[in-house]
């Protein structure tokens, strides 16, 4: 019998049935890849969809004969933005209050990672349908964030994707909350001489924002009839992604987590973002959640849990943000 802790996959949430189904599919793929070396694997969302994080934690706790114990939580986010730095830890802190004796180790975001670059390249090749890379400009579309560190990472991912793959050019942009926009990036590619563009959405699963990427790309193409524009598929649930999730699990369990906090807006007063330092973080609530009536108690408990977080590095190795001072990151409420 395995003595390793259960694995909790944490997603943001979406109202897209296809997005929920793809998340569920990935949870199943991760479970299958463990080969029994992880006693239990489950997943939940912090908002907008079921199962919630609370639902998943209840299941993992019930699966343990010796009580709550320890779990490993891996955030299914591509960049270390507000969800990964604040919203998900806040949701997990709430579960520490609900389940006395529960502790967790927190994995780092999935990206950037060579596995993701390879998946993106494969999706782009499918969209190219045999057309040469050298005549193709790639436009990578990130979600967009009020966290400059996360936005900068999209630029880094774009460069890593371009390096050594022979594309004619590569641009980055965002679908919400940040500039440049998708049309602006497409226009820049045209000014640089692009005649064929593949738009690559940097998203895990279907949802409102990926759909918006497709719509805006098609609208731009309609206004430029001599330009060939294709949209690559999403990263999606796949064996490669499941393997990366388990790599993050092993990192968290072994204490080998390497996060650079030097440009984190929640920790460092960056120009134009100083208001992010010093604001408390609170979890999202699902409709009908009984705990919503006790938000003040949970919020206070989160601050208590933060002290535990800082003091008990064994349970949260390498992840040393002070979540008590994280701002609740602005984001679009998606339908």
Residue ranges of each PLM-predicted region?
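Active-site-proximal alpha-helix that buttresses catalytic centers in soluble enzyme cores
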Residues: 1-335
């Amino acid at each position: 019998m395995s003595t390793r802790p259960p694995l909790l996959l944490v997603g943001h949430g979406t109202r897209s049935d296809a997005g929920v189904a793809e998340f569920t599919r990935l949870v199943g793929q991760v479970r299958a890849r463990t080969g029994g070396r992880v006693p239990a694997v489950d997943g939940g969302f912090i908002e907008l969809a079921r199962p919630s994080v609370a639902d998943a934690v209840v299941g993992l706790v019930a699966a343990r004969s010796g009580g709550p114990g320890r779990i490993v939580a891996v955030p299914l986010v591509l960049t270390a933005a507000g969800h990964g730095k604040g919203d998900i830890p806040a949701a997990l802190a709430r579960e520490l209050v609900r389940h006395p004796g529960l502790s967790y180790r927190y994995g780092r975001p999935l990206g950037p990672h060579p596995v993701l670059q390879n998946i993106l390249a494969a999706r782009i090749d499918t969209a190219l349908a045999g057309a040469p890379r050298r005549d193709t400009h790639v436009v990578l579309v990130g979600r967009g964030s009020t966290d400059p560190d996360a936005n900068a990472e999209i630029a880094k991912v774009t460069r890593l994707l371009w390096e050594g793959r022979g594309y004619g050019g590569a641009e980055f942009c965002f679908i919400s909350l940040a500039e440049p926009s998708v049309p602006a990036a497409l226009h820049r590619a045209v000014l640089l001489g692009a005649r064929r563009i593949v738009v690559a959405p940097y998203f895990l699963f279907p949802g409102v924002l990926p759909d918006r990427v497709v719509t805006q790309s098609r609208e731009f193409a309609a206004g430029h009839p001599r330009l060939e524009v294709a949209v690559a598929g999403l990263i999606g649930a796949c064996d490669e992604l499941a393997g990366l999730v388990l790599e993050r699990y092993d990192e968290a369990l072994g204490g080998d987590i390497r996060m650079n906090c030097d440009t984190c807006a929640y920790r460092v007063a960056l120009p134009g973002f100083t208001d992010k330092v010093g604001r408390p973080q609170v979890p999202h609530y699902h409709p009908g959640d009984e705990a919503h009536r006790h938000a003040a108690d949970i919020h206070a408990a989160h601050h208590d849990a933060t002290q535990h977080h800082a003091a008990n590095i064994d349970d949260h190795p390498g992840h040393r943000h002070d979540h008590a001072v994280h701002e609740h990151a602005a984001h679009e409420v998606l339908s």
